[in-house]
Amino acid sequence: INGGVDEKSHEQCGPNYAPITSEYLNYDEVLPKYVQMLDWLAGLYVNVLNLIQYMHDKYYYEEAEMALIDTDVRRTFATGIAGFSHVIDSLSAIKYAKVKVVRDETGLATGYEVEGDFPKYGNDDDRADEIGVWLLRTFLEMIKKRHTYRNSEATTSILTITSNVVYGKYTGALPDGRAAFTPFAPGANPSYGAEQNGLLASLNSVAKLPYHWALDGISNTQTINPEALGHSEEERKENLVQVMDGYFDQGAHHLNVNVFGKEKLLDAMEHPEKEEYANFTIRVSGYAVKFIDLTREQQMDVISVSYTHLRAHE
């Protein structure tokens, strides 16, 4: 939108092409420019990773690990996606609503005002979810068409661990309404506050992403209030198993599930010295971690993830 210029530093960080100067964003104008920028970024990404892999080899990183392997090795080239849901919702907002650009005194876009409603990823709405499928396929194709070190097989992931917090710190406002320099939603999770139709609709959206296009992982983290799963312990276990079975039956592969109340997290954050929290472990996008070992900013990000309540009709 800004023609490759960073709105915070005012530096030319990407390819120098004509910025969008209109008051409202037009989907047919934004999409080709986004694809152009994404293709440039994919090329830069692969080039940097090629250098990293070469340096690993130079200092015997891989040789030491694989010295005893006497078979042909299938080499993969891992890449990853962050801010996935925000791109989907941003393109959806531009396509289905009206997005007004807020500019600074130099004319650079620094914020956006969304007028009207638009379909959001995470609600089992094909209008938004199909943008996600297109985005994943397009990015992987851009990676695959480039030379990779040792002719390795290009793969990708939608899995951020806790880096979504760091990446968000350096990313300005987006057309989906996300404020500047705030955390991205983790992994393949819908954007914060986007889920309006309950847990099952959210899972259905993520399950539509073809796993064979993201063999390094499509991470989805859900924190569920125990009461949302039923009244008794047995009922909760049974309902959770059914939810997970339904998700994986659709071809999904990775689900991080936390079942506890928000109050427990808040108390652990304020009173980490309590004995009960010494080994209190939660699932974060891709791995398990002791909650009290996270930074306060990371803890707040975990707490910000929407607590899901199963709707009556589900």
Question: Each predicted region: which residue ranges?
Answer:
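Conserved small/polar residues in nucleotide/adenosyl-binding loops
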Residues: 308-314
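Unusually extended, aromatic-enriched hydrophobic runs near protein termini
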Residues: 135, 139, 143, 193-202, ...
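Catalytic nucleotidyl-transfer cores of nucleotide-processing enzymes
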Residues: 1-17, 150-209, 220-222
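Internal maturation/activation junctions in enzymes
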Residues: 53, 64-66, 101-187
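Structured mid-domain segments that build the active-site/substrate or prosthetic-cofactor binding neighborhood
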Residues: 1-116, 199-305
